[in-house]
From Swiss-Prot:
The keyword Cytoplasm does not apply. GO terms for cellular component: mitochondrial inner membrane. InterPro entries: Mito_Carrier_Antiporter (IPR051508), Mitochondrial_sb/sol_carrier (IPR018108), Mt_carrier_dom_sf (IPR023395). It comes from the Eukaryota. Its main location: mitochondrion. The chain crosses the membrane at residues 21-41, 59-79, 112-134, 184-205, 220-240, 292-315. It holds the Pfam family Mito_carr. One of its GO terms (biological process) is blastocyst hatching. The lineage of its organism: Eukaryota, Metazoa, Chordata, Craniata, Vertebrata. This is Solute carrier family 25 member 34. It is a multi-pass membrane protein. Putative antiporter that exchanges dicarboxylates and sulfur oxoanions across the inner membrane of mitochondria. Solcar repeats lie at residues 18-111, 115-208, 218-309. It is found in: Mitochondrion inner membrane.
């Protein structure tokens, strides 16, 4: 989930801008490339968030006890390739969600909305909400596939899907089209607050790093450091919604397609806090940060390089 400084401060020179359609392709491609590297962390985060679901602390087995031991547990149970569970669904989600998000934000930039006070945050939040809605079915399948594992280390409900298409077909057949958007009520605020927080903090964080003169002027290390600092704010506001999203997406449903554990966002928040304590809303926050930091930087790097290529093709010889 990243938007670069170039997007946050729209260029006045048209030669430095690409069309919203191009931004859609570049943004989706960049985030998909980043997803390939960070998906193992997403698998670990998902398992940690489901571990001990609606059980009091200390009353359940803990096959996952931290980042390193969790990676080892996944590799032992599912093989090394198990660390890439749900990758196809993750790529689909990143492509859909970020494609829509970059496209909508680029439209806002072209219209001059981001130059208004608070426009950057509002545009980022709205673009994030729209992207989350479009990508919700892919996130649903990704979560369920990443939760699947052997009985010895299983956490959360096990859906037993055979793959992305099989999962989509099963959900459609059993729950109808609306079933594909089950859990979207938590996904939309999750991406909305994350997108707004990222946009509100990245520029100032990068500027602060540059003011410290730790790196050479225009060094990519300043972008990296700014992104890592910004990621702290993003994880802090996203983590509770992330836990709730994972649980709503993964819970079993009855024949009418209603969740058997939670009635929705608020119900999940209340039940989780009552039975596991408030800190349960930050389960998996370590891997979440370890994933988001690299994902942010990789997305920025890939997006920036792809954008440079697009601008060269758009204005050859300049």
């Amino acid at each position: 989930m990243t938007l670069t400084q170039a997007q946050m401060a729209p260029a006045t020179d048209s030669r430095e801008m690409v069309s919203p359609a191009v931004d859609l392709v570049l943004g989706a491609s960049a985030c998909c490339l980043a997803c390939v590297f960070t998906n193992p962390l997403e698998v670990v985060k998902t398992r940690l968030q489901l571990q001990g679901e609606l059980q009091a602390p200390g009353t359940y087995p803990r096959p996952y006890r931290g980042f390193v031991s969790s990676v080892t547990a996944v590799a032992r149970a599912d093989g090394l390739w198990g660390l890439q569970k749900g990758l196809a669904a993750g790529l689909l989600y990143q492509g859909l969600m970020n494609g829509v998000r970059f496209y909508c934000y680029s439209l806002a930039c072209q219209a001059g909305l981001t130059q208004q006070p608070g426009g950057t945050v509002v545009a980022g939040a709205v673009a994030g909400a729209l992207g989350a809605f479009v990508g919700s079915p892919a996130y649903l399948v990704k979560t369920q596939l990443q939760a699947q594992t052997g009985a010895a280390v299983a956490v959360g409900h096990q859906h037993q899907h055979q793959g992305v298409l099989s999962a989509l077909e099963t959900i459609w057949r059993q729950q109808g089209m609306l079933g594909l958007w089950r859990g979207v009520g938590a996904a939309v605020p999750r991406v909305t607050v994350g997108s707004a927080a990222q946009l509100a903090t990245f520029t100032s964080a990068k500027a602060w790093v540059q003011d410290q003169q730790w790196f050479l002027e225009d060094s990519w290390l300043a972008t990296l450091a700014g992104g890592m600092i910004s990621s702290i704010a993003v994880v802090a506001v996203m983590a509770p919604f992330d836990v709730v999203s994972t649980r709503l997406y993964n819970q079993p449903v009855d024949r009418a397609g209603r969740g058997q554990l939670y009635g929705g966002l608020t119900d999940c928040l209340v039940k989780t806090c009552q039975q596991e304590g408030p800190l349960a809303l930050y389960k998996g926050v370590g891997p979440a940060y370890l994933r988001l930091g690299p994902h942010t930087i990789l997305s920025m790097f890939f997006w920036d390089e792809l954008r440079k290529l697009a601008l060269r093709a758009q204005h050859p010889g300049t």
